[in-house]
């Protein structure tokens, strides 16, 4: 039997609104291993988006735990490599976790290249040349390298979706 490599462990996850009157999530438990493909399906209002947004703490869960790559990201403090308790840096974990929103937006006044390099330059403090090199490599992977100078209005819906994914 193969050993599973757990990436995300969700245990008894809850998200309640109106002081518990509305239970968007009520005891969700799931283990997602590296390489797994997971589909979340259900009718409108069943908590799919709330669950996904909770995985990277865009929604703060009411209860339960989310362990991502061995770290319980629902805790305010975690143990660092030296064994000291330090404040959790959720941005560090978000850099390893990608999400494509149902309704994604690209800045219409910016080229695809500018859209793709904005976050690496502003958030990761990457220099422009390095950010552009990485963006071109990603665009090449999804077959859109030749569209780097285009504006979002010049792309099809599917092309915009691929840009949002990379």
Regions found by a protein language model. Name each.
Residues 3-166:
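ABC family nucleotide-binding domain
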